[in-house]
Amino acid sequence: MIQHDNNKMYGTTILSIRKDKSVVVIGDGQVSLGHTVIKSGAKKVRRLSGDSVIAGFAGATADAFTLFERLESKLDKHPGQLMRACVELAKDWRMDKYLRKLEAMMIVADKSISLVITGTGDVLEPEDGVAAIGSGGNFALSAARALIDIKGISIEEIAKKAMKIAGDICVYTNHNVVIEKIEE
């Protein structure tokens, strides 16, 4: 769970689902300062690297933007190699005195791989194609896993239903979602 400091911006839910040669990343739009909602329509899911990569962040907003910029530069150095770019970012994040203090997590995905990147240097690929981060992450993850094997439901529907459940339960997650999709 994210620690709360009334002077920092925290809390969100980011969910990634990979199924049938498609991947979606969805995130809510709420930004909280302590226990107060200060923005409801933030865009925490973005496309990077010429739209071939989707990234979503949870945690301190300014820290996440710093990480987006760093990841973009790593992707420029290692085009088409998302895993390598993420490992390089995680190394910097863990080793650099300034970056080490950043309080955020990221989910990144391209057409072939989805990864969770943490500030402790972890670069994790979910076993089942479903990953979630943020204050409502466990709610969204549970809901997505429950829905993923149901026939006739699209990957976007799964993502939206899971985020609705997370938004209904987590006070730091709202229903204003941004969803991005990559298909093979």
UniProtKB/Swiss-Prot annotation:
Gene3D superfamilies: Glutamine Phosphoribosylpyrophosphate, subunit 1, domain 1. It is an enzyme of class 3 (hydrolase). The active site is at 12. This is ATP-dependent protease subunit HslV. Keywords: Allosteric enzyme, Cytoplasm, Hydrolase, Metal-binding, Protease, Sodium, Threonine protease. HAMAP family: HslV. Its EC number is 3.4.25.2. Its main location: cytoplasm. Na(+) binds at residues 167, 170, 173. One of its GO terms (molecular function) is threonine-type endopeptidase activity. It comes from Wolbachia sp. subsp. Drosophila simulans (strain wRi). Belongs to the peptidase T1B family. HslV subfamily. It is found in: Cytoplasm. The gene is hslV. InterPro entries: ATP-dep_Prtase_HsIV_su, Ntn_hydrolases_N, Proteasome_sua/b, Proteasome_suB-type. It catalyses: ATP-dependent cleavage of peptide bonds with broad specificity.
